[in-house]
Amino acid sequence: MSEITNSQPQDASTIPNDTNLRLVTGYDGSPPAIRALDAATSLLRGRHGSIEVIYVAHVPSVDMMSADALVEVEKDFDEIEEELRTEAAAQLGNRGLTWHFHRRQGNIAAELIAAAVGIVADHPGDTGVIVVGSSSHASHRVLGSVAVGLARHCPVPLVIVP
């Protein structure tokens, strides 16, 4: 699991057109995630790079679970991962883009940041950009959302799709 650190997000509109992009997109199959994946395909169109589709499995209190319960949760995550991978493949299928599907576990914002930082480290000279959809849930206005957490702590350019 990754820790969130404070930093200032960069402006994605200032990325030169000849830069290879590594677009990290959080994906859970929700309408905001689908919009974010569509936006990522638009951002990558006509450029070199890839879309890194990230499903973050979040278990709030692993310490309170028995070993048997953890095995069941892992099976559920495997099923969800396969379902989301299939949905992403259908959405990205014949667009001629390079994309990869990854599953991570932990805090969603922290894991998206860690994925972006790690992917850029693996591809020196490329630019990592996180693309996420914004949530319209009323509870997120009070408690915060993934997009808000990313906006506060993201060390790479960030695109929040309405």
Describe the residue ranges of each PLM region:
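Structural beta-alpha unit
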Residues: 1-18, 90-130, 137
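Small/aliphatic-rich secondary-structure junction motif
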Residues: 13-67, 71
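Glycine-rich, Arg-bearing micro-motifs that act as flexible, cationic patches
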Residues: 129-153
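Acidic, proline/glycine-rich short linear motifs
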Residues: 3-8, 55-83
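Short, well-ordered secondary-structure micro-motifs
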Residues: 36-37, 63-66, 111-114, 141-143
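Short, structured coil segments at secondary-structure junctions
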Residues: 47, 95, 146, 153-155
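Short, flexible loop segments at boundaries between secondary-structure elements
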Residues: 156-162
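General small-molecule cofactor/ligand-binding pocket signal
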Residues: 52-54, 100-104, 159
